[in-house]
Amino acid sequence: MSTIHVDVVSATESLYSGEVLCVFAPASTGELGIYPKHTALLSILKPGEVRIETDKGIESIYVSGGIVEVQPDVVTIFSDTAIRANDLDEFKVLEAKQRAQDEMDNSIDTQDISATQAALSESMAQLQMINKMRGKKC
């Protein structure tokens, strides 16, 4: 079976490097499905789930946004923050979401609102992954 090499890299570490059957990433225009021999492209990522499918199963990684570079035999995902789905802490995510909502309610500066909206978007994407994982386990 044909494979494609995938690297997922954050600002602090390499989270994944290996041969996969396919990878799905949250592009700014919608979910991007990448298979071996894919056409070369460069796309912006929004906060969400990167799903890596191998012959052993599926691995999920949260990315806070970033860039995906696709070549026919290599996919590289760069993100400031990348966290394995199993390492997401629901309590911390809920705290961050509440903090962002409180800041939105109390802020009048448009720059503050913009940054707070980004933080809220990241928290919501993380919660969506946590809830999806919980659904898989039941």
From Swiss-Prot:
Keywords: ATP synthesis, Cell inner membrane, Cell membrane, CF(1), Hydrogen ion transport, Ion transport, Membrane, Transport. Signal peptide: none annotated. It is a peripheral membrane protein. One of its GO terms (cellular component) is plasma membrane. It holds the Pfam family ATP-synt_DE_N. It is found in: Cell inner membrane. Gene3D superfamilies: ATP synthase delta/epsilon subunit, C-terminal domain, F0F1 ATP synthase delta/epsilon subunit, N-terminal. It comes from the Bacteria. GO terms for molecular function: ATP binding; proton-transporting ATP synthase activity, rotational mechanism. Produces ATP from ADP in the presence of a proton gradient across the membrane. PANTHER family: ATP SYNTHASE DELTA/EPSILON CHAIN, ATP SYNTHASE EPSILON CHAIN, CHLOROPLASTIC. F-type ATPases have 2 components, CF(1) - the catalytic core - and CF(0) - the membrane proton channel. CF(1) has five subunits: alpha(3), beta(3), gamma(1), delta(1), epsilon(1). CF(0) has three main subunits: a, b and c. HAMAP family: ATP_synth_epsil_bac. Belongs to the ATPase epsilon chain family. NCBIfam families: ATP_synt_epsi, PRK00571.1-4. This is ATP synthase epsilon chain. The gene is atpC.
